[in-house]
Amino acid sequence: PIIYKGNLLDDLFNIASVVWLMVALAAILTLTIIYFITLGEMKDAQKLKDNIYISDKVKTPAVYGIIKPKIILPTEYDANKLNFILMHEKAHIKRKDNFIRLLTLIVVCFHWFNPFTWLMLKLLYSDIELACDESVLSKCDEAERKEYAYTLLSTAEKTNLFVASFGGCKIRIRVEKNLYYKKNFHLI
């Protein structure tokens, strides 16, 4: 009689399933730890007004939180750039970008093995920043657009996974889109 080694395929599937689950759980655990560390750092932030806070723990302006989002500014920020920064961060809040970021991070945790998932994450984060830039630019004249581009350049820093940040995305792309921005005209 012929004996098939069908158990080998079952064993490989079981091993792959366990590896997938362990990596997914490790990723979720890592993100949870990062989230609580970030949350702890934000407890020391001082309230300026409404949902705007200042903290020495952040390097660039950012929005923290999903249910009650807070705009966190670094202690050393330029008051001349504050209007642009607040417009940008308020666009993140209005668009619920932190919720979208959280959902995409969860997707990446479960699809960590797929390189297209990582590409999607990178492109989505870039698009989020560009959409907020466009929201700000739609309210600016040409001189203000140049000032906004300068503001982007001066606040460029690495950002946190969980926050929508003014300094996120590739700054060169954002500045170029900023300088060549054309307002959309609607006929209706």
Regions found by a protein language model. Name each.
Residues 1-188:
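Membrane-embedded and juxtamembrane structural elements of multi-pass membrane proteins
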